Amino acid sequence: MNPNLNIEQDNASEIIAGVDEAGRGPLAGPVVAAAVVVNQSIMIDDIKDSKVLSKSKRESCYDKITNNYYYSIGIASVQEIDKYNILEATKLACIRAVKNLAIIPTKVLVDGNMNFTDNRFISIVRGDQICYSIASASIVAKVTRDRMMQILHQEYPVYGWNQNCGYGTKLHIEAIKTYGQTIHHRVSFKFKGNINHSAILGNMV
């Protein structure tokens, strides 16, 4: 099933923002959330959960979404992930994304099953698969975070972030064992194997 506008159309009197995140699982980098308020008169082809789209298709959809819809980004840093835990940091990123919108939504549809104190927020399990607004947000969040990791890769190339985007691939884990963790690694995330915990600062070659 492709995402559709059924929920948005059933709540036609509301200003609805779809929200999704990227980066809950990686060993490095922030968690990034996006909020999107769609213009229902402009439907973009190929809007789906970002995970099922190719990189080129995500980039194409990203350009169309950001040129035609209200959107914003919210970020929770590695330090916040380690301080609060990944769930609370993800919620923080989602809240920030909504606050950063140029338009104030009256209802916020969030992918997943998180609980929020703001009663505008409604969590929808697998929302990125059924809700057009959430799927749009998933694309914006994914492309934004991937681009951030590309930039960080230039400073720390041995970890392969241009390919793994901070996820725990074999290359990434071996690099951590060899070179240690950077300031962009989540020290609260554990995995098997011995690690050199000394932080690596500055450029790496």
From Swiss-Prot:
Its EC number is 3.1.26.4. Keywords: Cytoplasm, Endonuclease, Hydrolase, Manganese, Metal-binding, Nuclease. NCBIfam families: PRK00015.1-3. Gene3D superfamilies: Ribonuclease H-like superfamily/Ribonuclease H (3.30.420.10). InterPro entries: RNase_HII, RNase_HII/HIII, RNase_HII/HIII_dom, RNaseH-like_sf, RNaseH_sf. This is Ribonuclease HII. The lineage of its organism: Bacteria, Pseudomonadati, Pseudomonadota, Alphaproteobacteria, Rickettsiales. The gene is rnhB. Residues 14-201 form the RNase H type-2 domain.
